[in-house]
Amino acid sequence: MNYQDYIWDLGGTLLDNYGTSTAAFVHTLQDFGLTASHDEVYKALKVSTEYAVRQFAPRNKEFLKAYKANEAKELEHPILFDGASELLAQIIQQGGRNFLISHRDDQVLEILQKTQIGLYFTEVVTATNGFKRKPDPESMLYLKDKYQIQSGLVIGDRSIDVEAGQAAGFSCYLFDNMKNLEEFVDIELEKE
């Protein structure tokens, strides 16, 4: 194992949520009498939710609230990327620690419970903690100081994850798929 501590992003890294988030966004656009293609919305959401709202519904003050409500319905049945749970478990079995930082509120805790991966995290940081949003490194520096992290890897699917991790002095991995990540962190998953 190349690192002792792993700081994870949730959406798009452990949780395969961009499809459901995109569907909720397109549905919300339709509710507001607006249209955009699935692919356009998907690309915009990969930048950020705020960016997507500015692109497709900039003059609708209630849009974000309606989208978040639709997205919450979609996320009632969260789906992990294949191998995510096993990788988290193996890190723990090999003496490592997992941490999670998300921009979402305490809905994250429900998602972790539904996907049964909450037990793999030493600490989960959500919007409720009140830290500045990534790419600001404040939440990562909090974990670094509290847990005295020396050998840490930040894993996320967006440039803001990498920027925050680098600013906090961590190594970073821009997530593309679970198999490549397993090879990068040099963990042998136990096969049943």
Language model segments and positions:
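Short, flexible loop segments at the rims of nucleotide/cofactor-binding pockets, characterized by
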Residues: 74-79, 102-103, 130-132
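Conserved phosphate-coupling serine/threonine residues in phosphotransfer and NTP-handling enzymes
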Residues: 13, 101-102
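N-terminal helical cap/lid subdomain that shapes the substrate entry/recognition surface
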Residues: 2-82, 86, 94
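Asp-based, Mg2+/Mn2+-dependent phosphohydrolase catalytic module
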Residues: 1-4, 37, 89-92, 105, ...
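Conserved short hydrophobic patches within well-ordered secondary structure
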Residues: 18, 22, 101, 111-112, ...
